[in-house]
Amino acid sequence: MARIAGVDLPDHKKLEVALTYIYGIGWSKAREVCEQTGIPSIKKLGELTPEELNQLRRYIEQNIKVEGDLRREVQLNIKRLVDIGTYRGLRHVRGLPVRGQQTKTNARTRKGRRKGTVANKKKVSK
């Protein structure tokens, strides 16, 4: 297994797919990395020479913000929104959707499990 940006990448996958295991690199960014380094994207990661691996590491290190740095930046951006008291920051704090989605019926992923109502419990008959 090759290790790039602190992530073990699977040798049996194509380079384009293996690079997406790194946080911050998706399909389009993986293709861009392959084009910029001149390494064919259909080549499997296990078939790469040590020179090609070093070339990949250098390119990713110098040009793309990945893993810990990217996660830290996202967290700091959210913290900044909360600190300055924006509406988006408030939504993050309350655990509700941030981008304007409706919450009357949906947003279960963000809000968590549904809470039962007291009105639906059967009343005791005399």
Swiss-Prot record:
Superkingdom: Bacteria
GO molecular function: rRNA binding; structural constituent of ribosome; tRNA binding
Record has Calcium as a keyword: no
Biased composition (Basic residues): 107-126
Sequence segments annotated as region (Disordered): 96-126
Family note: Belongs to the universal ribosomal protein uS13 family.
Function comment: Located at the top of the head of the 30S subunit, it contacts several helices of the 16S rRNA. In the 70S ribosome it contacts the 23S rRNA (bridge B1a) and protein L5 of the 50S subunit (bridge B1b), connecting the 2 subunits; these bridges are implicated in subunit movement. Contacts the tRNAs in the A and P-sites.
Name this protein carries in UniProt: Small ribosomal subunit protein uS13
Higher taxonomy: Bacteria, Pseudomonadati, Aquificota, Aquificia, Aquificales
Gene name as annotated: rpsM
